Amino acid sequence: MSNQNIRIKLKAFDHRLIDKSAVEIVETAKRTGASVRGPIPLPTKKERFTVLTSPHVNKKARDQYELRTYVRLMDVISPTDKTVDALMKLDLAAGVDVAIKLN
């Protein structure tokens, strides 16, 4: 696995959770002898929703909601077998979505 790279993409709605998970991944990879690029913060996706508060009339009464999706990207360069095993056993927070690709 010395000539391959691992690309890890983290997605979450809470920036504190995603930053803690990114730190855990970086520490685990460095402890097993691999080098890491990142975490690189990608642009935050903001979805805005406007909802009428009144069920019948009063068009002027509205509530606005926003859903932010935070994304971090990391590259693990020249991972060893120990690195892959440690990353597979790593237990991250429940609100973080992890996507792993081998290059």
UniProtKB/Swiss-Prot annotation:
GO terms for biological process: translation. GO terms for cellular component: ribonucleoprotein complex; ribosome. Transmembrane segments: none annotated. SMART domains: Ribosomal_S10 (SM01403). Pfam families: Ribosomal_S10. Keywords: Ribonucleoprotein, Ribosomal protein. One of its GO terms (molecular function) is structural constituent of ribosome. Disulfide bonds: none annotated. It comes from the Bacteria. Signal peptide: none annotated. InterPro entries: Ribosomal_uS10, Ribosomal_uS10_CS, Ribosomal_uS10_dom, Ribosomal_uS10_dom_sf. The keyword S-adenosyl-L-methionine does not apply. PANTHER family: 30S RIBOSOMAL PROTEIN S10 FAMILY MEMBER. Involved in the binding of tRNA to the ribosomes. Part of the 30S ribosomal subunit. Belongs to the universal ribosomal protein uS10 family. This is Small ribosomal subunit protein uS10. It comes from Vesicomyosocius okutanii subsp. Calyptogena okutanii (strain HA).
